[in-house]
Amino acid sequence: MFKLKQWLIYLVCSLVIMNTEGLFVNITFVRNAVAKGAVCLDGSPPAYHLDRGSGTGINSWLIQLEGGGWCNNVTNCVSRMHTRLGSSKKMVENLAFSAILSNKKQYNPDFYNWNRVKVRYCDGASFTGDVEAVNPATNLHFRGARVWLAVMQELLAKGMINAENAVLSGCSAGGLASLMHCDSFRALLPMGTKVKCLSDAGFFLNTRDVSGVQYIKTYFEDVVTLHGSAKNLPRSCTSRLTPAMCFFPQYVARQIRTPLFILNAAYDSWQIKNILAPRAADPYGKWQSCQLDIKNCHPSQIKVMQDFRLEFLSAVIGLGRSSSRGMFIDSCYTHCQTETQTSWFWQDSPILNRTTIAKAVGDWVYDRTLFQKIDCPYPCNPTCHHRVFTPLDAPPI
């Protein structure tokens, strides 16, 4: 009976995936990018996937920046350059578009007929790096900022220059990039274009880990230094703080002039695994079972995570009140909710104030309603889709 139930669950999930990911979009390599030095870690050209809009959405654009962490030293950047996160040679030719990228109204009611773009991530520093020199021993190229500009210029030439609406979105490292590039994206478009930015799971918190060490601060310092990112971070932040601090949204977002929507889990699974309890702070693996499934967490670990949530909320609320900043902070153990159909818009999607993520974002983009809600603490929200991992899923940084 148990095996039959498991098989039925697998079948239903498979049908959901088949139905919602029916659209596969071809890859496009950026023309003349290599000549401009706008390249992935391995020197290959950057890439994106574009599905053209139609009808009422023909002059509206949604740009989704791919996530995938960062590389903070030569060794892990060399490893990365042999994967899709460092080389367009390793990227799939056809990419499934679902959730916020879906072309079906029933799965993506507000953006289904927009021009929808997935910008591939292959620079390892959230599209911020720019180092001219290339070490011949490694052939590593740190050119994320050039990649960003080259892709945007090509999209402008393909019609984005005529956009009536434009949303810059992204997940994880892409969510951080959508936040940091928000105002520069606005500057690329005509004054008459309505421009907004959405950061999904990109609000990485500057905090100490369970051993009391500022692990993520040191990690970001290494990323910014290696990639030469300082000159490409928002000047409104770098004029006040060290460049590495400007990799943290809590020090950047207040100065962003373009309307911004922050979508994040207060118990973000990536942050729990890599900021709160990274491997270096947990040498005996006491947090491993908890990180794989929040239901396995000991009460003392839940207490630490509740404190993390309060610190996260303090950073978000500390941005100050804004009549243009949207917010959907749920209490789910998850990461990236715009790219998964069941989180974005489904019969049992996570809700706050009886509102799905897709509706909250859509209402904000179209100025129907300003959504600014923070969930009650775990485990109060029964609509959450808590992620369950295996030890092989995305090993910690």
Swiss-Prot record:
The lineage of its organism: Eukaryota, Viridiplantae, Streptophyta, Embryophyta, Tracheophyta. Its main location: secreted. The keyword Signal applies. This is Pectin acetylesterase 8. It holds the Pfam family PAE. Transmembrane segments: none annotated. GO terms for cellular component: extracellular region. Residues 1-22 form the signal peptide. Disruption phenotype: Reduced inflorescence stem growth and increased levels of acetate in rosette leaves. The active site is at residues 172, 268, 335. GO terms for biological process: cell wall organization. InterPro entries: AB_hydrolase_fold, PAE/NOTUM. It comes from Arabidopsis thaliana. Hydrolyzes acetyl esters in homogalacturonan regions of pectin. In type I primary cell wall, galacturonic acid residues of pectin can be acetylated at the O-2 and O-3 positions. Decreasing the degree of acetylation of pectin gels in vitro alters their physical properties. Keywords: Cell wall, Cell wall biogenesis/degradation, Glycoprotein, Hydrolase, Secreted, Signal. It is found in: Secreted, Cell wall. Its EC number is 3.1.1.-. Belongs to the pectinacetylesterase family. Glycans are attached at residues 73, 353. It comes from the Eukaryota. One of its GO terms (molecular function) is hydrolase activity.
